[in-house]
C-alpha cells in the first residue's frame, strides 16, 4: 500500500487577526497544489469555523488541541465532540509545546487520542525527543515511550485514523533541523516499534511525518526518504514557501 503524502501547517498562536488567517487560506486556495498531497492547516481555535467555511476542497482543517472529556466543568477546554460537531476532521495531539508548557503526560495524550477517535476525529499524534535525550542516545526509547501509552488505548483498526508526527524538540522553532539521515532513521525506528507493538500492517500503512524547522530549502531532500510521508510545518506554514513544501514531491 502506498502511503499518501501529508503536509500539515500548525499555525500555533498565529496570526493575530481573522483577516490575516483568511488571507493565508485564500492564498492556498489559489495555489497550484500537488493533488496527491493531503493538506491540513491548524489555525487558532477562534478561527476554526471561519477558516473551515472558506477552505477549498484541497485544504482540510485541524484543531490544535482537544480535551479527553466530551463536556463538563473544564473551563477553557474544547471537547472532541464539539470539534467533530463543527465538521473539523483533524486534531493535533501531543505537541511538545503541550507536553512541556502545559505539562501533558503521555498518558493524558493517550486519553485525548482515544476520545478524539471515539468522536470520529483523525489525529496528528506528535512525538519527539529533547536535545539532551538525543545526546544520550535515547531518541528511539523516548519515542517508543510516548507511543506506548497510545498503543495501550487503541485497537489495530484505529491506526488508520492516526498520522504520527516525529518532531525532535530541539529542532522546533530553532532553525536547527534533523539531518535527512537522522529523520529517516527515527522514522524507521518508529515503524519497527509499531510492527512489534501493534502489527506489521499498521507499521507499513501508518503515515509518519517529520516536523522541526521544515522549509522550502530542506523539504525536497527530506521528502525523498522512503519512510518520511510528509511534514508538520510551523513557522513556514505562515509564509508563501508553504506551497513549495506542500509540493516537495511534485516533479
From Swiss-Prot:
Enzyme Commission number(s) from the entry: 5.3.1.1
Enzyme type, top EC level: isomerase
Full protein name: Triosephosphate isomerase
Pathway: Carbohydrate biosynthesis; gluconeogenesis; Carbohydrate degradation; glycolysis; D-glyceraldehyde 3-phosphate from glycerone phosphate: step 1/1
A GO BP entry: gluconeogenesis
Residues that hold substrate according to the record: 10, 12
Gene Ontology CC: cytosol
Gene3D superfamilies in the cross-refs: Aldolase class I
Active site per UniProt: 95, 167
SUBUNIT field: Homodimer.
InterPro entries: Aldolase_TIM, TIM_sf, TrioseP_Isoase_bac/euk, Triosephosphate_isomerase, Triosephosphate_isomerase_AS
Cited NCBIfam families: tim (TIGR00419)
Keywords carried by this UniProt record: Gluconeogenesis, Glycolysis, Isomerase
Family under the similarity heading: Belongs to the triosephosphate isomerase family.
Chemical reaction(s) catalysed: D-glyceraldehyde 3-phosphate = dihydroxyacetone phosphate
